């Protein structure tokens, strides 16, 4: 099958799969947005200002953009504690469990802009096992759209950027993947297909992603 105006995605091969967490595997947006809205009210910052730069970025990077006069590390800790204090609304997207089960045994990593503490808490909440390789936002020098997280994940897998396909949901995430010389399948769960136009392929949901393995190769087949 093929994406309109793009290469035949059945020819999209890789040796490793890197997967974003929030917005891709799970819908954590309601809880995260509530935490940020409350934080904005306490600090006199309009929620609309936060929304313009929030998605896909590390908490500390968003704070530096919207409130450079505050101590970003201190405020990030406050936001993190708020986000993980109540995860009732956090849920997996359809197809997430099946995708991760099918990937078992293949080289893979989860890459998140969130902290390791938050990522592990959310994975436990939704019932997904902790991956062997989890790269979190607090392990890297620069967050998305910088490629640091994806480069680190590939290195831990013993792969080059060209060996990897990434599953992402945000424009800044797609930019990060491209900067890491990786190919990207974007899921239009949080943004329009047009906003994700730099990706190699765009699907509506995780359930539209399928693949088969042949030796060390993983071949993606996407339902459009």
What name fits each language-model region?
Residues 1-15, 107, 116-224:
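Asp-based, Mg2+/Mn2+-dependent phosphohydrolase catalytic module
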Residues 92, 111, 142:
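Residue-level marker of regulatory loop/turn positions in helix-turn-helix DNA-binding domains and
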């Amino acid at each position: 099958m093929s994406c309109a105006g793009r290469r035949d995605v059945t020819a999209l091969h890789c040796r490793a799969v890197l997967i974003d967490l929030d917005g891709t595997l799970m819908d954590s947006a309601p809880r995260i947005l509530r935490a940020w809205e409350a934080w904005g009210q306490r600090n006199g910052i309009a929620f609309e200002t936060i929304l313009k730069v929030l998605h896909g970025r590390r908490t500390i990077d968003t704070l530096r953009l919207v409130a450079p006069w505050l101590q970003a590390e201190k405020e990030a800790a406050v936001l993190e504690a708020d986000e993980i204090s109540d995860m009732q609304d956090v849920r997996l997207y359809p197809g997430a469990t099946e995708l991760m089960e099918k990937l078992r045994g293949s080289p893979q990593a989860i890459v998140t802009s969130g902290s390791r503490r938050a990522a592990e808490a959310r994975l436990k909440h939704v019932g997904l096992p902790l991956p062997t390789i989890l790269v979190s936002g607090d392990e890297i020098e620069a967050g998305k759209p910088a490629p640091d997280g994806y480069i680190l994940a590939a290195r831990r897998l013993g792969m080059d950027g060209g060996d990897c396909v990434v599953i992402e949901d945000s424009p800044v995430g797609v930019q990060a993947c491209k900067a890491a010389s990786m190919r990207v399948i974007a899921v239009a769960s949080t943004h329009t297909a047009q906003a994700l136009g730099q990706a190699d392929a765009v699907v509506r949901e995780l359930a539209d992603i399928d693949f088969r393995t042949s030796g060390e190769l993983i071949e993606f087949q996407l339902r459009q």
